[in-house]
């Protein structure tokens, strides 16, 4: 686990929610099952195979050492999630988790939940994708070129919030989970862009009429119409 320990020891004090270590990226085969995220003020360690108590103690000690340097006097707050063979479990390892828990990414507020469930409300490994969407939409400020976005598998609609902040005319968010879309509505409201969005549970009615599909296809690039998680 040395690559993870090195990442912890060298990390700077994060302000935004961000991924600190991405073992699944393939650069460190011995740590391919691990990721470390920061959802301020909580650290989230995820393992895709069971971890021993000794391994967790070593990681916790590494976090404690670095956190005492980055935030002297502040309690280390962290949780461990194990995802293995289709099951997911989460343990509070230290401190506490805010409720409600809001984080920011490049000035955008998102509601997250790191204490239970498999997903946390914001996929930090898609931060670069959200930056791309922001740049794409901002590059089309004129009324005739402003895009309308179809956000498939929208989850909690982070891409929608970013697109609307960047100037999109409208975003339609589709997802099977009404609960996730409800959090998405909170995210839009918290960022002042609720008026520009609509939310559709794909189980409640047909996805889109033919005319609606034509309307979106005429205003979006192929890369924006592809399925993307928030």
Annotated model-derived regions:
Residues 143-155:
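Conserved class I S-adenosyl-L-methionine
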Residues 170-175:
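Conserved SAM-binding motif I beta-strand of class I
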Residues 156-168:
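Conserved SAM-binding loop of SAM-dependent methyltransferases across substrates and taxa
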Residues 1-42, 48-49:
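Non-catalytic accessory regions of SAM-dependent methyltransferases
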Residues 220-230:
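A short SAM/SAH-binding and catalytic strip from SAM-dependent methyltransferases
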Residues 29-30, 35-37, 56-127, 131:
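Non-catalytic substrate-recognition/targeting regions of SAM-dependent transferases
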Residues 179-220:
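S-adenosyl-L-methionine
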Residues 132-144:
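Glycine-rich helix-loop-beta junction characteristic of Rossmann-like nucleotide cofactor-binding loops
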